[in-house]
């Protein structure tokens, strides 16, 4: 399973750490990544605010699941755009 984790804060680090332990994970992509997250996956250098780049990259890389940390990214319409593209989304609020 290919997962894209959006965000680079402490919440996303905790999520990324756990996702990276999954036996079904093939690749963990990070948007944008951070010094703490980067060892867990593949940093893409995409801003968490760049909805177009997140959606386009998800389609290009055949991402199975997008996990979003920042609420601002969701408020900007990422959930709707991913749904239109047929990509699963996990909304995590801790």
Predicted regions and their residues:
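Glycine-rich adenosine-cofactor-binding loop
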Residues: 5-12
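N-terminal glycine-rich "phosphate-gripper" loop used for MgATP/nucleotide binding
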Residues: 44-83
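Structural detector of well-ordered beta-strand residues that form the stable sheet scaffold
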Residues: 29, 67, 88-90
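Extreme N-terminal starter segment of soluble prokaryotic enzymes
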Residues: 1-3
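N-terminal beta-loop-helix "entrance" segment that forms/cooperates
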Residues: 30-49
């Amino acid at each position: 399973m290919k997962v894209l984790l959006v965000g680079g804060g402490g919440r996303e680090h905790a999520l990324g750490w756990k996702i990276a332990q999954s036996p079904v994970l093939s690749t963990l992509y990070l948007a944008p990544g951070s010094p703490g997250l980067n060892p867990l996956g593949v940093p893409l250098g995409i801003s968490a605010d760049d909805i177009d780049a997140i959606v386009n990259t998800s389609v290009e890389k055949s991402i199975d699941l997008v996990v979003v940390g920042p609420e601002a990214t969701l408020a900007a319409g990422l959930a709707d755009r991913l749904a239109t593209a047929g990509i699963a989304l996990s909304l995590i609020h801790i």
